[in-house]
Amino acid sequence: MMKARLETEVSKYMSYVLRHAPDAAGLTLDSGGWVSFDELEKALASKYDVSRAEIIEIVENNPKKRFTLAHNRIRANQGHSVDIDLALNQAEPPAALFHGTSLTNWQSIEREGLKKMQRHHVHLSADVETAKIVAARRKGEHIILRVDAARMFSEGHSFFVSDNGVWLAESVPVQYLSRNAGTP
C-alpha cells in the first residue's frame, strides 16, 4: 500500500504526461491518446519508487476515474491539450448539466459563454455536487452554472460523454447558461 502523498503525486504526474506532455516522460501517444502500459510503467519507475501493482491501484482507485486501462494500454479519459481523437460517441444529455468555476470568470462567461480554452471540450457535470467539487479547485469565490442541455441539444449542439461520466461540449453559448444553480 503506497502512501497517500506519493499516490497523489504519481496520479498528478500521470495526468500531466497523458493529457499534456507525453514527451516529458519519453512517451508517444497514439491518435486515440493511448500508450503502452509497459512504457508508462518504465517512465514512472524512472521518477518514482512505484510498482506495476501500485500504478494499477492508482488507476483503479482514482475517485475521478481519470484513466482507462485496457489491453495493456492506458490513456487519460479527457482534458487533453495535445491533439488526439478520443473517438467519443455523441449522446443525448440530461435536461440540465452543470459547470463549476470561480466568480472571477463570470464576466467573461456572461459575455462569451463557456469556451474550451486549451482543452478539446468544455467539461460539464451531471449534478450540482460534482460541479461544486470542480469549482472548489478554483481560487476565490465559486459559482455553479446551469446549462440548459435539453434546449441546447434540441437546437443542434452536440454532446459527448467520456468513459468516466464527464459530459463534454465544443462550447456552451451564453443563452444556454444560468448562474443560479446551487449557489447563493
From Swiss-Prot:
EC number: 2.7.1.-
Pfam family, one: PTS_2-RNA
Biological role: Removes the 2'-phosphate from RNA via an intermediate in which the phosphate is ADP-ribosylated by NAD followed by a presumed transesterification to release the RNA and generate ADP-ribose 1''-2''-cyclic phosphate (APPR>P). May function as an ADP-ribosylase.
Protein name: Probable RNA 2'-phosphotransferase
Keyword Lipid metabolism: no
Protein family membership: Belongs to the KptA/TPT1 family.
Domain of life, source organism: Bacteria
InterPro entries (alphabetical): Ptrans_KptA/Tpt1 (IPR002745), RNA_2'-PTrans_C (IPR042081), RNA_2'-PTrans_KptA (IPR022928), RNA_2'-PTrans_N (IPR042080)
NCBIfam families with a match to the protein in the record: PRK00819.1-2
Species for this entry: Rhizobium johnstonii (strain DSM 114642 / LMG 32736 / 3841)
EC class name: transferase
Record keywords: NAD, Transferase
GO biological process: tRNA splicing, via endonucleolytic cleavage and ligation
Key word DNA-binding present: no
Coiled coil regions in record: none
GO molecular function: NAD+ poly-ADP-ribosyltransferase activity; tRNA 2'-phosphotransferase activity
